[in-house]
């Protein structure tokens, strides 16, 4: 299972800058909802490492991510193979550069979740979709989100770690007991991004598969 594809509907929801260190006394869901309104765009480089259930490394990759609210997302993997995942909030493209093949499908079909409702960041929507807890420290905070929809989302939980007012790490445990850690660096929040980055137009010679 490709953990990156699990994150398609989630990264655009949860990548944002922490506006201030959060307190343990506040409700975690309310805090998360409030934080969602603090960003318009997010850019970062990432390093990913995935472990199996016996903590053996089974995958490593690196690349960059770009997000523009509402709903636009671009994830570029440079290694071990070059892959670009793009959505404008409606259509999802997965372009395997080395294979010259692109897969096109509705975003909601892939995620089994309505990204538009979650991108609103409302407490009601978050409480309906996830059980959320928070583990704060003096200079950081980690949110854990457990989906109420169970296996329909293909993951057991996702953790978002914030330090120095920015999201610096995300961990996902999928239904195969595979744990993927994404570390973010060179982060830019609310810097200008062109909307064309979130549109994909296959060039001549690319095989397009519609699902």
Curated annotation (Swiss-Prot):
This is Outer-membrane lipoprotein carrier protein. Residues 1-24 form the signal peptide. The keyword Chaperone applies. Belongs to the LolA family. SUPFAM superfamilies: Prokaryotic lipoproteins and lipoprotein localization factors. Keywords: Chaperone, Periplasm, Protein transport, Signal, Transport. Its main location: periplasm. It is found in: Periplasm.
């Amino acid at each position: 299972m490709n953990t990156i594809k699990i994150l398609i509907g989630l990264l655009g929801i949860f990548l944002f800058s922490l506006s201030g260190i959060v307190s343990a006394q506040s409700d975690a869901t309310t805090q998360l909802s409030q934080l969602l309104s603090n960003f318009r765009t997010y850019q970062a480089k990432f390093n990913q490492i995935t472990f199996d259930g016996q903590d053996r490394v089974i995958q490593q990759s690196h690349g960059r991510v770009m997000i523009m609210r509402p709903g636009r997302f671009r994830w570029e993997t440079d290694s071990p193979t070059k892959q670009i995942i793009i959505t404008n909030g409606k259509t999802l493209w997965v372009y395997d550069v080395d294979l010259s093949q692109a897969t096109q499908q509705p975003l909601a079909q892939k995620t089994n979740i309505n990204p538009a409702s979650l991108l609103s960041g409302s407490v009601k929507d978050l409480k309906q979709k996830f059980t959320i807890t928070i583990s704060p420290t003096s200079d950081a905070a980690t949110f854990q989100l457990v989906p109420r929809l169970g296996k329909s989302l293909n993951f057991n939980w996702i953790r978002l770690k914030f330090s120095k007012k920015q999201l610096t790490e995300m961990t996902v445990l999928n239904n195969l007991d595979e744990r993927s850690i994404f570390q973010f660096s060179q982060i830019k929040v609310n810097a200008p991004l062109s909307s064309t980055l979130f549109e994909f137009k296959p060039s001549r010679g690319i095989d397009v598969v519609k699902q």
